C-alpha cells in the first residue's frame, strides 16, 4: 500500500522532514516514489515551515495513497493556510 509520510533529514537537534510517497513496507528513510513537500518544525524568522505540492498530493491520494496521521494534520493545516 502506498503511504504519504515524513522522512527524517536534517542534523543533530535540527530535525527536517521530507513529505514522501512510498510503499508502507519501506523503511522510514528508505527509497520513495516521489517527494511532495517538506516540513521544518524548528523554522525561525523568515524560514518556511511547511511546503506542500498540493497538485501532486491530490494525485497520489486519488491513486489510493494513505497519509500518515501527522501528514494528514499537516495537509489540513496547509489547505487552511492556502485558503
UniProtKB/Swiss-Prot annotation:
One of its GO terms (cellular component) is cytoplasm. It holds the Pfam family Ribosomal_S16. The keyword Ribonucleoprotein applies. NCBIfam families: S16 (TIGR00002). Belongs to the bacterial ribosomal protein bS16 family. HAMAP family: Ribosomal_bS16. This is Small ribosomal subunit protein bS16. It comes from Pseudomonas fluorescens (strain SBW25). GO terms for molecular function: structural constituent of ribosome. Keywords: Ribonucleoprotein, Ribosomal protein. GO terms for biological process: translation. PANTHER family: 30S RIBOSOMAL PROTEIN S16 (PTHR12919), SMALL RIBOSOMAL SUBUNIT PROTEIN BS16M (PTHR12919:SF20). SUPFAM superfamilies: Ribosomal protein S16.
Amino acid at each position: 500500500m502506498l503511504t504519504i509520510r515524513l522522512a527524517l533529514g536534517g542534523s543533530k537537534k535540527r530535525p527536517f522532514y521530507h513529505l514522501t510517497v512510498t510503499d508502507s513496507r519501506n523503511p522510514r528513510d528508505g527509497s520513495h516514489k516521489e517527494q511532495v513537500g517538506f516540513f521544518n518544525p524548528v523554522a525561525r524568522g523568515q524560514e518556511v515551515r511547511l511546503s506542500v505540492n498540493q497538485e501532486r498530493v491530490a494525485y497520489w491520494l486519488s491513486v489510493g495513497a494513505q497519509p500518515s496521521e501527522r501528514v494528514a494534520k499537516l495537509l489540513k493545516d496547509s489547505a487552511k493556510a492556502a485558503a
